[in-house]
A protein has these predicted regions:
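Short recognition patches in nucleic-acid-associated and regulatory proteins
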Residues: 26-36
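Short cysteine-rich loop/turn motifs with clustered Cys
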Residues: 1-28, 48-50, 54
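Polybasic, low-complexity binding patches
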Residues: 36-46, 54-101
Length: 101
C-alpha cells in the first residue's frame, strides 16, 4: 500500500442514500482504496451508477473522479480526462463531499 492509499484509509466510510457527488440515488458501494491495493477493510463511498461502468462509480474507476481525506473531511475533484491520483492532488478545485442529502 502506498502513502496515498494509507492516507485514504484514515477516513471514515461515506454512507449516504444519495450519491455525494451528483445527488442521484446511491446504489453501489465503492472501495475508496482499491481492494487490490489492500483496501478490503477500508472506507467505502456509496455512489450512483451500475457496476464500474456508469455514473459516478464509473468516473471513480476511470480516474476522472478523485477523493482525498484532509484529516477532518473528504474532498473530491472531477477531471474531464483520466488523471493519475498524484497529478490530481496537484490541481485546484477540490470540493467538500456532501454527506447529507
Amino acid at each position: 500500500m502506498n502513502e496515498y492509499d494509507k492516507a485514504l484509509m484514515q477516513g471514515p466510510s461515506i454512507d449516504t442514500v444519495c450519491c455525494p457527488f451528483c445527488g442521484r440515488l446511491a446504489s453501489n458501494a465503492h472501495h475508496i482504496v482499491p481492494r487490490s491495493h489492500g483496501g478490503h477493510d477500508g472506507p467505502t463511498v456509496r455512489v450512483c451508477g451500475m457496476g464500474n461502468a456508469s455514473g459516478c462509480h464509473g468516473l471513480l474507476h476511470s480516474h476522472q473522479l478523485h477523493l482525498r481525506w484532509t484529516g477532518s473531511e473528504w474532498q473530491y475533484l472531477y477531471t474531464p480526462e483520466p488523471t493519475k491520483y498524484e497529478k490530481a492532488l496537484e490541481k485546484g478545485g477540490w470540493k467538500h463531499v456532501k454527506t447529507d442529502c
